[in-house]
């Protein structure tokens, strides 16, 4: 454990950020998984709706600094490609 006051504060901040990032990433995975399940089932209407929801979640994660913008763009592109194949 750190003895320096600023480092003790930093440890708390890092832990709070880690938990927030973990929650955001978990919700992203859930949103993308729901889209994939709808796409696998062949439900085009539901897949398109879930694609939009997951896309918004990815954009929010980028704005919070949880994931890189290129990673979000790559995932959104893959979802769009999958939705267009239905």
Swiss-Prot record:
InterPro entries tied to this protein: Ribosomal_bS20, Ribosomal_bS20_sf
GO cellular component, one term: cytosol
Chain residue ranges for the region called Disordered: 1-25
Keywords annotated in UniProt: Ribonucleoprotein, Ribosomal protein, RNA-binding, rRNA-binding
Keyword RNA-binding carried by entry: yes
Role this protein plays: Binds directly to 16S ribosomal RNA.
Listed name of the protein: Small ribosomal subunit protein bS20
């Amino acid at each position: 454990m750190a003895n320096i006051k600023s480092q003790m504060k930093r440890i708390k901040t890092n832990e709070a950020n880690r938990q927030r990032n973990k929650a955001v990433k978990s919700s992203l995975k859930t949103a993308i998984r729901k889209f994939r399940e709808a796409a696998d089932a062949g439900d085009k209407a539901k897949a398109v709706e879930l694609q939009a929801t997951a896309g918004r979640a990815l954009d929010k994660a980028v704005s919070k600094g949880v994931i890189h913008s290129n990673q979000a763009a790559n995932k959104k592109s893959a979802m769009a490609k999958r939705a267009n194949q239905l």
